């Protein structure tokens, strides 16, 4: 199935690329989420007319992500949680908790943007957490977990 990408898609291509993908990936993900359109003559012509508009929208998204990354780079978030004597938390700190703490400190962050590659945080301490704001923009935030 040949498609024209309407936005940058990770591990596939950039805006305007003509790509060949499996039918299921195209029908079940790219087309329903508006990330691509079928590559036929009519859609190619329509895309070329809208190309400047789509590129401007993509540039605006990236610029806003970069400004949020600059704000996040300056932040250090403290999260309090109940913990035992040895610093082991009763429960854990996950992406949702970190996203809520960042949003409360003034920078809007979605749960899906927070990356914890080693799983949830289960110990008291300081952690560097990656926040994936855009396919090209990633910020690191210092998260301090203290016992309540």
UniProtKB/Swiss-Prot annotation:
GO biological process entries: translation
Domain of life: Bacteria
SUPFAM superfamilies (alphabetical): L9 N-domain-like (SSF55658), Ribosomal protein L9 C-domain (SSF55653)
Pfam families: Ribosomal_L9_C (PF03948), Ribosomal_L9_N (PF01281)
Record keywords, A-Z: Ribonucleoprotein, Ribosomal protein, RNA-binding, rRNA-binding
This protein's GO CC annotations: ribonucleoprotein complex; ribosome
GO MF annotation, one: structural constituent of ribosome
Protein's UniProt keywords contain Ribonucleoprotein: yes
Family as reported in the entry's similarity comment: Belongs to the bacterial ribosomal protein bL9 family.
Physiological role: Binds to the 23S rRNA.
Protein known as: Large ribosomal subunit protein bL9
Source organism: Pseudomonas putida (strain ATCC 47054 / DSM 6125 / CFBP 8728 / NCIMB 11950 / KT2440)
